[in-house]
Amino acid sequence: MSRKQLALFEPTLVVQALKEAVKKLNPQAQWRNPVMFIVWIGSLLTTCISIAMASGVMPGNALFSAAISGWLWVTVLFANFAEALAEGRSKAQANSLKGVKKTAFARKLREPKYGAAADKVPADQLRKGDIVLVEAGDIIPCDGEVIEGGASVDESAITGESAPVIRESGGDFASVTGGTRILSDWLVIECSVNPGETFLDRMIAMVEGAQRRKTPNEIALTILLIALTIVFLLATATLWPFSAWGGNAVSVTVLVALLVCLIPTTIGGLLSAIGVAGMSRMLGANVIATSGRAVEAAGDVDVLLLDKTGTITLGNRQASEFIPAQGVEEKALADAAQLASLADETPEGRSIVILAKQRFNLRERDVQSLHATFVPFTAQSRMSGINIDNRMIRKGSVDAIRRHVEANGGHFPADVDQKVDQVARQGATPLVVVEGSRVLGVIALKDIVKGGIKERFAQLRKMGIKTVMITGDNRLTAAAIAAEAGVDDFLAEATPEAKLALIRQYQAEGRLVAMTGDGTNDAPALAQADVAVAMNSGTQAAKEAGNMVDLDSNPTKLIEVVHIGKQMLMTRGSLTTFSIANDVAKYFAIIPAAFAATYPQLNALNIMRLHSPDSAILSAVIFNALIIVFLIPLALKGVSYKPLTASAMLRRNLWIYGLGGLLVPFIGIKVIDLLLTICGLV
């Protein structure tokens, strides 16, 4: 369940962002963005020149210089506003999480067992290793592992999902999160973190962006922008002596305006906002990323390791067919299978009862009325069934039933072995039914592949992403399901060691690997993967090993995570293309205006036929500032994303953002020039 989405320009956020934009005018804040720092210096320089002209210290048009100076300050403010708005949206999301943190008291047990003496201590004083007792109505005071008890827990404050979940000692459901509430029963919990290190604390810090660091691609792009800025700075600096030598020196104000319009201020002003917004969009999908690096890596992923159950298939195997052994009627097999499943509350057991009812109208029977005894499934026996009168009926895996038959002096029929093999080849799981020592036949339990999943894998393949299905099934079953689902490869009979080895193999080939996991046994593979999405319902070890946590605990979310990562990279690339294309158009506006008096031949470049040199320069500076504001929604929401091949995506972006970046400035600058002329401002 996703959290409530904030409006793009929430009034309270806009007001706060405007205040923050002004605060960010200090040199220390500006220095972090080298491109905008150059604009900030230019604004300061032109302001000083305007004051000097107004006071008569320097000759020149003080009004024009002041107008240029004002719009340069506006450019810096707009860039600050874009970053502050993105950060404000993240902080607003974090505030909803802060509401979960409550200063409360905890019952710290003196011994690690229920009923032991307890001391009442502030929750924020609990340390790693402390044992606490929580009962119905209590807020869990710390992250930890359940060591005794079982309870229903409301995790909606963290996940946004209203349905309660069961947390109990042992297994993969022992992990609890501080800030969640016990609805029933009790738990004895061992705290796994120190104050300030809880999952909730880390979520708040990550969402607020306090720990946001520039990603490798962001650093590389920043270096490129700095290089372009230095090139244009040197080029602009050499223009003054050239113009002076020509007998009509260009003013410093015009040179500063030229520099600001030529350097990539658009992407420079939006780069931080794009990174912050990427993490914010991930949170909108109920996924917490530990860093911007994790989001960026998601965009570069080219191998997806996907668990079969819950991701590729619906997760609940359904009985699809009764296949009797030689000499056994199908109805007799269905009758025995239904009897063995009457008290089996698993989805598989319920589906067997329903199939027998549909095929042979076997209904209105229950264990109690039949005076029968239900035999539950255990990890040791790997069978379940029923004892009724003198009949002993069992259903279970092939190996378990084979051992059972041989232990009772029977013989496992060869024709049933063939039927088991046939079921496995069709992608179903064989379940064998036996009465006493006589094998009655096989039930085919079919994994239902999710609708539309094959098409999604085809889209991923177009994007150059390889999909690998991970399953504990045997190779025959795995191969059949893989073919039906349309994945590129599969790992059958998967063990934690096999998953880890597979990830390392792909990484050795230079690929980036993404996977999901929820158990402690998944932790080594999660730690190795480039993008590791841990389920919030999983163990503490899994969550610590991953670099993302899915609050919905939905394995399918991995595909959405990759889409969000790719959208962030596309947004950054598209706006960079647009920004650089902008510079070309602004060149045709400013160069003729600035140097036509010295070099009349440059008038040939004045293809926009702007009103005057002053209006041309001012129009370009105004456009340079306004375009940042107009692109803020695109930076925050991301460009529209379609699963395409890399070459098709490049062509599409060059047409839209390259050509658009050339045309929009020509139109925008011309319109602004006309408005300035009509209003008599130039």
Swiss-Prot record:
Membrane-topology descriptor: Multi-pass membrane protein
Annotated binding of Mg(2+), by residue: 518, 522
GO molecular function annotation: ATP binding; ATP hydrolysis activity; magnesium ion binding; P-type potassium transmembrane transporter activity
GO (cellular component) term, any one: plasma membrane
Segments traversing the membrane: 34-54, 62-82, 219-239, 254-274, 588-608, 616-636, 662-682
E.C. number(s) listed in UniProt: 7.2.2.6
Subcellular location per the Swiss-Prot or TrEMBL entry: Cell inner membrane
Annotated catalytic residues: 307
Catalytic reactions on record: K(+)(out) + ATP + H2O = K(+)(in) + ADP + phosphate + H(+)
Main localization category: membrane
Binding residues for ATP: 344, 348, 377-384, 395
Stated family: Belongs to the cation transport ATPase (P-type) (TC 3.A.3) family. Type IA subfamily.
Function field: Part of the high-affinity ATP-driven potassium transport (or Kdp) system, which catalyzes the hydrolysis of ATP coupled with the electrogenic transport of potassium into the cytoplasm. This subunit is responsible for energy coupling to the transport system and for the release of the potassium ions to the cytoplasm.
Subunit structure: The system is composed of three essential subunits: KdpA, KdpB and KdpC.
Protein name from the UniProt record: Potassium-transporting ATPase ATP-binding subunit
Organism: Escherichia coli O81 (strain ED1a)
